[in-house]
Amino acid sequence: MKTEFAIWLVSYLIRRGPDTQENIINEWSKYINEDVEIHRNTFGNYRKKAEELFGTEISYNPGTKEYYIEDKDLITHNAMYRWLLQSVSASNVI
């Protein structure tokens, strides 16, 4: 689940923009069609996995309590990363 969540998280933040951890987890629950609770530390581990997979930083704004990807172009202009994100989008439709 860690890798799947990591890929989904990057896709979500690119599509939706900055969002809170609570909203992100709610959207993940809808995506997998299952109620889940993700502890703050677990979320942090998943976030780090996403950063490792995509070679980017998922930043946090303490003022708004939102996570975001500052340099989306780094991901969207890389063919392999685009393929990963498109795979997630395609499975979301199915």
Language-model features: locations:
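Short, basic/aromatic recognition patches that contact phosphate-bearing ligands
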Residues: 1-90
